[in-house]
Structures are given as C-alpha cells and as structure tokens.
Regions:
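Cysteine-centered motifs
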Residues: 4-5, 10
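Bacterial N-terminal signal peptides that target proteins for export
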Residues: 14-21
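A short glycine-rich, His/Asp/Glu-containing loop-to-beta-strand
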Residues: 53-97, 101-102, 153, 160, ...
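Histidine-centered metal-chelating micro-motifs
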Residues: 92-94, 111-114, 130-131, 135-143, ...
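Glycine- and acidic-residue-biased ligand/ion/polar-headgroup-sensing regions
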Residues: 99-118, 126-129, 216-237, 243
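Ligand-binding loop in jelly-roll beta-barrel domains
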Residues: 119-121, 134-164, 251-274
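Acidic/His-leaning functional-site neighborhoods
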Residues: 172-264, 271-274
Length: 274
C-alpha cells in the first residue's frame, strides 16, 4: 500500500478554501490507491474450454493441452492443467513418463486403476484423492477399472516449488460428509489436511446446498484462487458460475462464495508466481 500526502498551496487567504482543496486532493489519492488494489478476476465459461473426443477418451481442457493451444490459457499461476476426463470401459492411458510436476487425480464417478514405476498399484474412486510428485521422473498408467461404465475424473497439474525432487505417491480417502455445506481441504503443502503437495497450494471441495454462504481466506499475498463449479450454480467473487464454469481470482485477501443452487465446487489456491 502506498501512503501519499498532498500539500496544496492557495494564494487566497481563506482557511476553508485550503481545507476543501486539501480534502479533494486526499480523496483523489485515496481513489487512486483503491483502484490499484482492486481484486482481479478472469472468467472461463465451460464452453470456452478445449475439447477432444478420441472415442475412448472424451476430454475438456481448461488450459492449453495436447493439440489444443490458446496463448491466453497457458496456466493460472502455478496451476498448469485442469482436465475433465471421461474414459470408456476398459480403456485408459498407457504407461508414459512425467517429471517435475505435481499431478492430482480426483475421481468423480466410476473406478480408476493406477500403476506406476514406484510400485504402486491401486484403484481410486469418488471420495479418493491421489497425487504423484513426479520429481526426477516417473512412469505410470491410468485406466478404467470397469468394462461396463465410464470413469470420470479430474486430472490437475501444478508446477512444484522445487525441481528434481525424489518422486513420491500419496492417496487418501475423504469422508464425503465432511464436504456437506463446507469446503473440505483435500490437498495441502504439509499434508496435515488431505494429501501433500510440493507447492504453496490448497485444494478444497464442497457439496453445498442452495443459500449456503461463506468467505474463503487466501494463505498470504501473491496467492490466487481458481474455482470450478462441478455441478449446480455458485457465485464466486461476484461471478455467477454454472456447471463446469470457472473463475480465477487474485490480488485479494478473501473471496466470497454463495451457492445459488445445490452445487459441488472445486477450489484451487496456488501462488501466482513461484
């Protein structure tokens, strides 16, 4: 915050004239200072996402990914990828490499089968949250565990706060009742809530009833929030959002949230620079 003092000299020997001019000057500076600290937002309606249908995979990209490139949608702070994936029965992503990325998977429905070069082999489903810290490099595969139904999940990539870490894997099963009319933390930097991520980043998920209101406090200056409505309707930071709409918000200490319909909300806090 900048503090300014304006001194206005008036040749007229009228005290009230000088007071009025000084007051007007201070009001102008106050207005300028407030304008500099205005909350910033970017709105990403659901229809503006990249889309690809590969038959076995129907995917929507919030940020540039694979063959979809939008120079204005490269990332939001340290948030690099937010893919909304649906994989048909028995299909999936074959074994492939990653490095220096924090990769979070959040199943929405169905069962997702995971295997990796660290020796992990598991199936995750709604209520589970998985993270791979790729670090110096890992190999992994993800496939639909079931033959007769789709698996739907969010694939989220966050840039780490340090390169070439030793690869790690984390998984947790959350109590869905803890998401009822509140924001449940499912990812945090120290792992005290949810799984641990190597970044100043917190993920929250909420299952909200119409009329629910709250305010989310960011974890310090330089942080931003990216909120996506998974189902229903929610107003975040004054921006009305429908299903799969998203808004990015930064340059603020708090964000007001109101469910205008029964809804499911994902909120991702990340540093805007890292």
């Amino acid at each position: 915050m900048y503090f300014c003092c304006i001194y206005i000299y008036c040749t007229y020997n009228f005290d009230m004239t000088r007071v009025h001019l000084l007051a007007l000057g201070l009001l102008a500076v106050t207005g300028w200072t407030q304008a500099q600290s205005t909350m910033n937002t970017v709105f990403h309606p659901a229809y503006s996402r990249g889309h690809a249908d590969h038959g076995w995979l129907d995917t929507h990209h919030s940020f540039s990914f694979a063959s979809w490139h939008n120079p204005e949608r490269m990332h939001f702070g340290a948030l690099r990828v937010l893919n909304d994936d649906a994989v048909t029965g028995g299909a999936g992503f074959g074994t492939h490499p990653h490095d220096n990325m924090e990769i979070v998977s959040i199943p929405l429905s169905g069962d997702l089968e995971h295997q990796d070069s660290m020796g992990n082999a598991t199936v995750i489903r709604e209520g589970d949250v998985q993270i791979m810290s790729a670090g110096t490099g890992i190999m992994h595969s993800e496939k639909n565990h079931n033959a007769g139904e789709d698996v739907r999940f969010l694939q989220i990539w966050v840039f780490p706060n340090e390169r070439d870490l030793t690869p790690t894997y984390g998984q947790i099963t959350m109590d869905l009742d803890d998401q009822r009319d509140k924001l449940q933390c499912v990812v945090s930097p120290d792992g005290s809530e949810g799984v641990q991520i190597h970044q100043s980043s917190w993920f929250h998920v909420g299952r909200l009833t119409a009329g629910w209101k709250d305010s989310y406090a960011l974890h310090g200056t330089g942080q931003g929030v990216y909120a996506m409505v998974l189902e229903g309707e929610v107003t975040v930071g004054g921006q009305p959002l429908g299903r799969r709409d998203a808004v990015g918000i930064w340059n603020t200490e708090r964000v007001d949230i109101e469910a205008t319909d029964d809804a499911r909300l994902l909120l991702i806090e990340v540093p805007m620079q890292w």
